[in-house]
Swiss-Prot record:
Its EC number is 2.4.2.17. It is an enzyme of class 2 (transferase). The keyword Plastid does not apply. Lacks the C-terminal regulatory region which is replaced by HisZ. Belongs to the ATP phosphoribosyltransferase family. Short subfamily. Catalyzes the condensation of ATP and 5-phosphoribose 1-diphosphate to form N'-(5'-phosphoribosyl)-ATP (PR-ATP). Has a crucial role in the pathway because the rate of histidine biosynthesis seems to be controlled primarily by regulation of HisG enzymatic activity. This is ATP phosphoribosyltransferase. It comes from Rippkaea orientalis (strain PCC 8801 / RF-1).
């Protein structure tokens, strides 16, 4: 049976709609009373695992799920050994550098050498500032990253932005974009090749919905 890792959170609703459009119903995950983390489609064709977004590529990489849906941001941050099969074109957001609106720094290259940047996307932030040849200290924060500059812990943050409302409410402005992110369909590379007859028809159906 096909096993699919589906992320909790912002991508869940659109992921459920996508699978419904190809004949797989995992809508029970949307029921507020649901406590199950694994459900089987009523047609008994596939089962879905409801996991944290950061864990989706882990379940796929280790072969516990043949397919998964994950944000492009996590693929760049975690660099898992998975096959990236399709851009699903939902869940749009962007990875941005932001500073307080009152900051004298209007561009990342204006940040002071060895300045501090708070982020939960440590690898993405390191790579970005490395390309700028700007030595900064990346402070890993996994809660409200916006508090970094507010409390004076950091001069800037690197974080995902969708509407920009949270930044605005906390007095922050974007000064650069690292990359844009949407949901992607991923697969376990070996499982995909060995079970092509089972998996590929579903992948084709998903791709057809995107065209």
């Amino acid at each position: 049976m096909l096993t699919i890792a589906i992320p909790k959170g912002a991508l869940l609703s659109d992921a459920i709609k996508l699978f419904q459009s190809i004949g797989l119903d995992f809508s029970a995950f949307l029921d507020p009373k649901n406590r199950q983390l694994q459900i089987t489609d009523p047609t008994n064709t596939a089962k879905a695992l409801l996991v944290r977004a950061t864990d989706v590529p882990v379940y796929v990489e280790y072969g516990q799920a043949q397919l998964g849906i994950v944000g492009y941001d996590l693929l760049l941050e975690k660099t898992p050994t998975v096959a990236n099969l399709a851009n699903l074109k939902f869940g749009y957001c962007r990875m941005s550098v932001a500073v307080p609106a009152s900051s004298p720094y209007k561009s990342p290259v204006e940040l002071p050498p060895n300045g501090k940047v708070a982020s939960k996307f440590v690898n993405c932030a390191k790579k970005y500032f490395h390309t700028l040849d700007l030595p900064v200290e990346i402070i890993p924060l996994y809660g409200s990253v916006e508090l970094g500059p507010i409390t004076g812990m950091s001069e800037a943050i690197v974080d995902l932005v969708s509407t920009g409302r949270t930044l605005k409410e906390n007095g922050l402005i974007e000064i650069d974009t690292l990359f844009e992110s949407t949901a992607h369909l991923i697969a376990h590379p070996l499982s995909y090749r060995l079970n092509l007859d089972q998996i590929n028809p579903w992948v084709t159906k998903i791709r057809d919905t995107l065209s």
